[in-house]
Amino acid sequence: MDQEGGGDGQKAPSFQWRNYKLIVDPALDPALRRPSQKVYRYDGVHFSVSDSKYTPVEDLQDPRCHVRSKARDFSLPVPKFKLDEFYIGQIPLKEVTFARLNDNVRETFLKDMCRKYGEVEEVEILLHPRTRKHLGLARVLFTSTRGAKETVKNLHLTSVMGNIIHAQLDIKGQQRMKYYELIVNGSYTPQTVPTGGKALSEKFQGSGAAAETTEARRRSSSDTAAYPAGTTVGGTPGNGTPCSQDTNFSSSRQDTPSSFGQFTPQSSQGTPYTSRGSTPYSQDSAYSSSTTSTSFKPRRSENSYQDSFSRRHFSTSSAPATTATATSATAAATAASSSSSSSSSSSSSSSSSSSASQFRGSDSSYPAYYESWNRYQRHTSYPPRRATREDPSGASFAENTAERFPPSYTSYLAPEPNRSTDQDYRPPASEAPPPEPPEPGGGGGGSGGGGGGGGGGGGGAPSPEREEARTPPRPASPARSGSPAPETTNESVPFAQHSSLDSRIEMLLKEQRSKFSFLASDTEEEEENSSAGPGARDAGAEVPSGAGHGPCTPPPAPANFEDVAPTGSGEPGAARESPKANGQNQASPCSSGEDMEISDDDRGGSPPPAPTPPQQPPPPPPPPPPPPPPYLASLPLGYPPHQPAYLLPPRPDGPPPPEYPPPPPPPPPHIYDFVNSLELMDRLGAQWGGMPMSFQMQTQMLTRLHQLRQGKGLTAASAGPPGGAFGEAFLPFPPPQEAAYGLPYALYTQGQEGRGSYSREAYHLPLPMAAEPLPSSSVSGEEARLPHREEAEIAESKVLPSAGTVGRVLATLVQEMKSIMQRDLNRKMVENVAFGAFDQWWESKEEKAKPFQNAAKQQAKEEDKEKMKLKEPGMLSLVDWAKSGGITGIEAFAFGSGLRGALRLPSFKVKRKEPSEISEASEEKRPRPSTPAEEDEDDPEREKEAGEPGRPGTKPPKRDEERGKTQGKHRKSFTLDSEGEEASQESSSEKDEDDDDEDEEDEEQEEAVDATKKEAEASDGEDEDSDSSSQCSLYADSDGENGSTSDSESGSSSSSSSSSSSSSSSSSSESSSEEEEQSAVIPSASPPREVPEPLPAPDEKPETDGLVDSPVMPLSEKETLPTQPAGPAEEPPPSVPQPPAEPPAGPPDAAPRLDERPSSPIPLLPPPKKRRKTVSFSAAEEAPVPEPSTAAPLQAKSSGPVSRKVPRVVERTIRNLPLDHASLVKSWPEEVARGGRNRAGGRVRSTEEEEATESGTEVDLAVLADLALTPARRGLATLPTGDDSEATETSDEAERPSPLLSHILLEHNYALAIKPPPTTPAPRPLEPAPALAALFSSPADEVLEAPEVVVAEAEEPKQQLQQQHPEQEGEEEEEDEEEESESSESSSSSSSDEEGAIRRRSLRSHTRRRRPPLPPPPPPPPSFEPRSEFEQMTILYDIWNSGLDLEDMSYLRLTYERLLQQTSGADWLNDTHWVQHTITNLSTPKRKRRPQDGPREHQTGSARSEGYYPISKKEKDKYLDVCPVSARQLEGGDTQGTNRVLSERRSEQRRLLSAIGTSAIMDSDLLKLNQLKFRKKKLRFGRSRIHEWGLFAMEPIAADEMVIEYVGQNIRQMVADMREKRYVQEGIGSSYLFRVDHDTIIDATKCGNLARFINHCCTPNCYAKVITIESQKKIVIYSKQPIGVDEEITYDYKFPLEDNKIPCLCGTESCRGSLN
């Protein structure tokens, strides 16, 4: 050891050590107390200093061992599977492609934008390969499919950085690559790249060679890569569509129809877009059904379209081998039949080796035929589809199909040996036995279960679509949510078809809710035509073949059953329409021609009424089908599925399909067809003005609906799957019961299929309904029975190998012809409507311009009008029109039911007047705002719920009547061979004109009446009336529903329903004439109807009264159609009241009306009626009057005049309560919305009707029966416009408004003077609350309005009033006669109608003279129109929404007490007691607005029309306080202190001056600066009395003191001129430029101080002085005189004199009047 180491005598320890360490070194640490003392430590324990204070190291350890070092966490993320080209299985929808992004969107922004919807894994923005420019494309990969779907749902078509972006789910970025190539190739810019299918697919169609090259390049990664282009590749089961992936329709799951464009690097092709499917079916089973995605339901049309479309991968864009042919059929087939993508559809399913090129659609007819075939097959698809639902696993699919399909079928489904990847993971399905005759399940050929798949392979392998059909419909399938994403890429790339004019027109028409309901959409035509083209959607995929599964068998392409099947499952055409381009909702079975785009709300809210099949008498069926399967029996009938867009005819080479027996008339519709809350809400949205429904209300209503359904026995036969995967809750529109008879026979004879599977399947089968009109279809009766045709074809094609080719050619020809015809028809209709509308408008204007015609002319005109009407049988016109080329002849209309789908012309106006509104308008002598067209369009659907046409006991919707009528009219204009009917367009237009003339007549007659009362008003009213009439006339033709229908139909309604009550002014006069004419016309007009209505006897009083009272009665047309007991017209009924079951008879003179129809129901289907204008006549039109004697209606006639003078105590009923939510709920929505006036205004309910309604439901059944039958006798042409159920009460009631009623109406008639009421009636006690039975009316009553609830004193019966004033009766009658004659004279209608008018007047006077003055018979017992079940329930359960009010409480208690008194089975009630519930629905009265609450109200009620009113100074002074409180407080404050300071400053200034001593110094800058410093004053600005703002002193200012400096920018003259111009342009009206000298100006406009607020005054209290400080000129304001606190500072601007004077506003005595 080194001796120095110890240092300084330090001794080393005596022991041997191995290590030592110098612990302390004094040289390094001089602060140590012990100098030069080194301390060593040996071996970590011993120290060289004995008394060392250091501690030894206790735990010795190897320094090389890092025990104490911290372990660092190492994250090893779980590796994620990469979905490369070898991936097999469902590709999760985690990848979202964004297009059309703003080029400022970068990864971080996009990631943040998407992060809110789910965890983002990768974000990539595509840049141009060379320029690195932003391409507007981005890829976002989410960790979950939910995030991706939510992103697409929320971001698609939203604006991001100013761009409407396109987001879609994109499997493996195939669409993104298409966009990328389109942009990089220069074909499109990032903002114009087509995200819609047609342009995109066409862009990629390319030539075959190009397709091959690009495909070879692209497909290297796909499972078909192993095969040369053009060879058939064994369809990998994994492929939803084995067809070449590049085909537009490959993987049906892609968002865009052309999911695999020709240039798409389609590597994932092996897996169809199955991920969408919620069902786990394996990919190989090709179950990439669109239904799969559970996240949200695709829109019906999209889904159906995309599924059928994407499934039918018929794109020809792919390489020859995999052309579209292979695609569609094989697509589905490959899954199960594993036939190669190209071969399966083209070659027989069994031989997948045959190449697809064989049928590749080389001949254009092939694709077109395919299209039609697909459409057809989609409808005829059979239950086998269910297999997938029940057994989704792909592996077992073959076995399933073996069970379900006939052996022949399954043999085709058997997996092919050459399946590429399929064999790896899927055991081949057992080979099926050799083909046997197809079983029902197998259906015919491809149409059979699997074949039904959209492209569902040649054998009917469950195509993705097929499978989808099997999957239960989900209430919210992705597509329906509207997000493009899950709905298969089809939607994400909406087709460019929309850019075509036809398609856009079609979409516009769709928005109008199918005015042309029978027209096939142009999109379909376009698709059919283009299907042969490169982008043919359905092109070569399915090759029709006669053989059941022969090489040519086109697999049916069912519409997306997820959406369609459930809804339209019962329709013959359910999915028959060609798949629509994306975005164009394919008319699901629920949609009719133009109706195709029925959105969810429409779907829920307005399904078209079920067609009434019985009207088409089909020939007897060769094999009569068995009764409908139980599943059909259990289906709710309320919603007839929408009619398919159009049905393609079966291939001509097949034998004619067997006919089906006419289905029985459908049972009455029931509201309990809302199978789930979504449906209910949808319907409610349309029906009840979008009223909010709480969860409890929905629940209770649905429960009640279910109970009602069961109670009605509708579910009695529900042997279907009880609440199965597709319980009724999933069926938006289950097929109507009659649909069962339309089913193909195969469906009935389900072999082993078993009823359960059958019924479930059938839910989603489009059930062909032979009788369905198929409005937009060009299908004839036999075509409606395609399933049989298909089987026949299959059988025949086995015999004739060329049958398939022939069929395709013929189908193509037929299709082209149809499309041409449809286009021509569309054009013709549009032209007719447009020209007709113009003619009507012209006529109405001419009429308006004419002076009143003399009576002779008017009579002549009326006679002409009658002749015209006699000439026009509405039904025949329809028939003739159909014969002459109306879409497919009468079969398409199925007579009555076809009318629903028949010519519904679009409305060319924004608003349309409803007939009742028109009448009211004429009543009130001012046109009423008409209801928006949209509402009218909703009406038919809304009404459907109340009454389906053809359902016993229900009224056909008014729209139907209108349509029937207008169809008669408009069709007539196109008829080529009229055959007993006028073919000329004139007849229709003339009739319309006549109708309008009638309107005008009526209105003018009313005006004449008014003139007698008040000429000034009459003249006013006339103008307005003629306006309204002109509107009517215009509308009459333009939309074929309103003007003419309102008149002619109301007239027609009155024809059978004595028009008196139709005193709805518009139809009053015309109704009378029309009655006479139309009643005569009816027998001829409606051949189907067997009950002729003889011309009413001339002595008919009804019209007379209607006319007389019409001026004062805006009654809804519904009254015009009282239910008349249909006795022979000749028998005058006894004048005694009839039993309640029938409307009380009127006096003999009215008898013909009453007894026109036999009271017993006639087995004719009632033609559709028009919607009710308002719920009932009682509802909106009259204030309820307590029960008068039975003769009340008659009294109304005879004493009508008297009643006007009787003071009217208006009962407070639900009807005339304020228009709040409860009243809305308690009435039909049309009452408020459509009627054009709110319920509060419609307080005119006749006594008779009120009482009749009150009397309960005993009358209702008979009334209903009559009501349902009434239209049957009434020829379609003469259907009433608004025949409301109230009309059913008595023809007399309807015929003549009650006198009291007329008085009430007079009160609400703003054009007529009100006669003073002579007496006050005695109040009557309240009516008893309706019994419980009334609350839940029977189904038959559902069309009728609910009984009114009287909530206040009623007035005494009319009878008493009339007895009190019998003497007035005669006077009033005479007055009426005078009024009538005057009105008829004053009517300004064309000469053609005048004759009719004379005749009518003579008839009226005749009947009047003969009318006995005897007291009328006692009034009929009160009868109320019962509420429909739906309305009843809505009112009942509205307490969940609006709360419980006192009235509800009282009725609940009353009901409770009555139930307690009943001994029937409610023992549990005895254990309950009534507990008062808190009233939760308290109406808070509106605070009355005080006049000073704000600016005055606008005179017109619209600020937009008037802008702001200028506020006068007087008005300003009311609230403008010039002196704020602070200033006033200063006034009283101590101003002495300030004055003292001022005087001190002045004195200091004087001392300073005297010290300087020279006067020259007075001008020095120093002094001036001093002044500026010391002389600033306290000022404020405020509102000035002179002009705008002003400057006010806040302290007293002495004379000659500086007040303020004018501060601003020093600018030159030139700059000032420029600024002044700019300020004027910017709208800065005031000038703040102050000139200092000739070249310097101070601009205080933008920067300055308070001095700029100083106003000009001709006698100012200040002056401006320019001083120079530090060589800078300043403007200083000095006081001229002492200025007090709050006095405004003013000075004279001294503007130079100019010609253009600026007015001075100072208002002083010496004001010069101008500033310059």
Curated annotation (Swiss-Prot):
A motif (WDR5 interaction motif (WIN)) lies at residues 1501-1506. It holds the Pfam family RRM_1. Keywords: Activator, Chromatin regulator, Chromosome, Cytoplasm, DNA damage, Methyltransferase, Nucleus, Phosphoprotein, RNA-binding, S-adenosyl-L-methionine, Transcription, Transcription regulation, Transferase. Residues 859-869 have a biased composition (Basic and acidic residues). The keyword Transmembrane does not apply. CDD domains: RRM_Set1A, SET_SETD1. Residues 222-231, 278-295, 315-357, 477-487, 1028-1071 have a biased composition (Low complexity). Residues 243-277, 488-499, 581-591 have a biased composition (Polar residues). This is Histone-lysine N-methyltransferase SETD1A. It comes from Mus musculus (Mouse).
